[in-house]
């Protein structure tokens, strides 16, 4: 039905007859000549119909937006005065000689030109229309090219694309599972995988050595801009490779991808330990485009008569950190109050501040409600450590170390945006040396997952002092987003059992949930390591989209619903009966 895509016709085709198919993007009658912008996935082209062919002209005059049509005509160069530099095909146009309406379109339920006027609900309900917009189409085409590039790289490096099961068993990976009832085993359920973690480890035990898969994963969790209940991972696992080798190989892949797709050379990725990232940036995924840093000042404040500072300064689990914002002395009291409310979202009880109005005047040139608690030497040292200059403001976080990191880390990002401080377009890094465990409500939890290997300790040493152990794990971070995370895996039964016990998983529970893994570890398991990238997030960053919903063909809403298909829906009662499932409605209490 076509000889060319609309966006592929160019000056080299002048004088040729072409057959095009697509959708009417816009149609206008200017002085008895109909100009038609025809659109397909590759772009737009202008088609001109004049009254010399009355039958065709009359049909062209009836066209409306989103009619699906076939056009036949002659490619010709546009007059110089009509060249459109904003269009890929702006140097040429097609003189229409034939026109067939393949399918008419009813009046549209949403705006194609001013899509900002469409609600998110409308865009998802009529996704097949929303995806016709060039911006959306180009993102999905870009995504397809990225996955093709990734496959080429991994195939050429000896990785095997092997599928793993979708119907599997629930495992503790930090989020709720989506459950699928079994008809043949009444009362029992499959779980949709949150990742192929255990299966890819089993593939290493099976001797396949290098595995990859571009795979759907599922997590029933609260959603936000960069989360979806179903998402896609670039999943990688290797045998007989160290963490350094895995990082080198996947960094090579990512650098090659950016060079091929965006003509961007990311350069060599710097390394940063987890502790350094948390200390300097309050985040384990720091955005290095932002020059602001947290500075520890607790040692200066242990003796001050201001409990807000001295309390955390003398607490082993406390922290006092300063954040300098260049030019921040211009902030109004209301703006400072807004920042105070902002850090309160993250658990901070307040936000002390110090304006450097004129450094040459000493204390006289400094304005702060806490200045009366600080002597001149302390103030001078705070100014020196933060590098503050006249016109700056210093903001202070004082609380438990975790609260300070989270609240001041978030404030650092907000201030960086508010003051337009971001430098450079792409700043990647590796974050390494994560803790093995973190304590939540007195219990140990795995920072990554329970199959991550510790660095340089025996099972007995790990159990004796789990709190201070470092994992052989690594995260690739770009512009404050975690692109992917991985680790060396545990490859002996003794260590795996020790980790389970530290996590409060009894030997009996471990046998029930992970017996197959523990048994597999007895039969010559090779050392192995891997990494998983979030494909949706990578595409979002590379295309500049504001949400991963804009780089997925058919995403869910923030409430995990699909307006297009009205999923989820109620199940047929007969099917529920076959599954042995009864739906229990929650009783609503009424007041007398």
Curated annotation (Swiss-Prot):
Catalysed reactions listed for this entry: tRNA(Asp) + L-aspartate + ATP = L-aspartyl-tRNA(Asp) + AMP + diphosphate
Domain of life: Bacteria
Assembly: Homodimer.
Protein name: Aspartate--tRNA ligase
InterPro entries (alphabetical): Aa-tRNA-synt_II, aa-tRNA-synth_II, aa-tRNA-synth_II/BPL/LPL, Asp-tRNA-ligase_1, Asp-tRNA-ligase_1_N, Asp/Asn-tRNA-synth_IIb, AspRS_core, GAD-like_sf
Cytoplasm is among the record's keywords: yes
UniProt cross-references to PROSITE patterns, sorted A to Z: AA_TRNA_LIGASE_II
GO cellular component: cytoplasm
EC number: 6.1.1.12
Keyword Ribosomal protein: no
GO MF annotation list: aspartate-tRNA ligase activity; ATP binding; nucleic acid binding
Listed SUPFAM superfamilies: Class II aaRS and biotin synthetases, GAD domain-like, Nucleic acid-binding proteins
Keywords: Aminoacyl-tRNA synthetase, ATP-binding, Cytoplasm, Ligase, Nucleotide-binding, Protein biosynthesis
Subcellular location field: Cytoplasm
Region (Aspartate): 197-200
Enzyme class: ligase
GO biological process: one example: aspartyl-tRNA aminoacylation
